[in-house]
Amino acid sequence: EIALPGKRHLISDLEIRGEDTFRQSCGKDAHLLLLPNHSTHSDPEVMSEVTRRLGIRPSFMAAYDVFARGRVQAWIMQRTGAFSVDREGSDRKSMKCATNVLVEGRYPLIVFPEGNVYFCNDQVAPFAEGSSYIAMSAQKKLGMNNPVYVVPVSMKFTYLEDVRDHLRSSIRKIARRFETELDAEAEFGRELSRISTTAVSYTHLRAH
């Protein structure tokens, strides 16, 4: 059973594809760098569940502001293999720590290369430079006889029921706040773009 119940994540099921290929390609003692996309705030918990099912214990690189959200959360994260990184600057200490984790090979290293949550299921944002730097630094230390395996991980979330009516209801309320209406006959994506533009213009005019 999935270990992500509750109102925070709202995830009822998890399907893993490519497990056999992953195990055959990487082996037990491989130096693994897992690079998942970052489409929701539940991604770290999902990756924890995935690695639990695969029987591996990972180490996470996480943004420092996640640790600042609370002492209890920071305490738990540190004791489950997570360490912080400053996304805004050159965090040499974190880069060194990540490289060492990869070189030692005791735990797979998980890095979200997009660097932030983008709420895009089917589109990946440009990667930050950190993940490639970590991989190449580790490979340089290990030498060519001990390869670093960089494993892309694609997470896709789907609704179990049709949520379009709920979404239209929410957008209709937002549209009215900015003195416009949702056109039910128009293509929804274009309407969403139009209402977003209207909201920005409305806010800009009210600010002046």
PLM region spans:
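Membrane-anchoring hydrophobic helices of lipid-metabolizing enzymes
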Residues: 1-48, 71-74, 78-82
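Basic/hydrophobic alpha-helical interface regions
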Residues: 5-19, 44, 52-59, 95-96, ...
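Histidine-anchored nucleotide/phosphate-binding helix
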Residues: 45-52, 135-138
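Short internal beta-strands
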Residues: 60-64
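Glycine-rich anion/phosphate-binding loops
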Residues: 90-93
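Membrane-associated lipid acylation/remodeling enzymes share a hydrophobic transmembrane-juxtamembrane segment
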Residues: 103-164, 191, 195
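Acidic, His- and aromatic-enriched active-site or binding-groove loops in soluble protein domains
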Residues: 173-184
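Conserved small/polar residues in nucleotide/adenosyl-binding loops
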Residues: 203-208
